[in-house]
């Protein structure tokens, strides 16, 4: 009996003469290349999340091509302007926590892909009147990724918002609220991940 999985022939144990040594599977090189491309795109999305959560501008810039555009809430335009807008948020001392879930990658050309990434974000920082505000946001990064010189980055991003909920922000400082739960997350270069990476 032969099992067919997306065009690949997998021999079951009963089809083999002699001892069972595992599946006989040949994966075309183009399939392996596609898997590597998908993983590179996911890494880029994770790099973006580190960039915004750790106020790490090197990681953030590394997620976009220099000529990219971003439609991102109140900002829409060239990605350089988005970086400046994000820098202002970083300087305000805002706390960001981004988590990504479903990532659907659809290749539309040899070196281009449309990528839909679901996200949840907790954003806490000063409002216009300097009062502390906190939001839970759910949405999707709807991206066009391009591969250049073997690297995948965002070329066009549209952030779609599916849910926004303002929460009551705790007024107590983080140290007593977190108690013994240390170390606290921090900005670049003070977060613990940079110790492990040797990037201090």
Q: Across the structure, where does each feature detected by a protein language model lie?
A:
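Extreme N-terminal basic, low-complexity initiation segments
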Residues: 1-11
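Acidic/histidine-enriched, glycine/proline-rich intrinsically disordered or flexible terminal extensions
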Residues: 167-200
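Short beta-strand edge/turn micro-motifs at domain boundaries
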Residues: 12, 20-22, 114, 138-171
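A solvent-exposed, acidic/Ser-Thr-rich amphipathic alpha-helical stretch
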Residues: 57-125
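Short, low-complexity N-terminal intrinsically disordered segments enriched in polar/charged residues
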Residues: 12-50, 54, 58-63
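Short, surface-exposed loop/helix-turn segments at secondary-structure junctions
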Residues: 127-135, 171-172
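Short, surface-exposed coil-to-beta transition loops
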Residues: 98-100, 136-141
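Short, cysteine-centered beta-strand-loop-beta hairpins and adjacent loop/turn segments enriched
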Residues: 122-131, 164-165
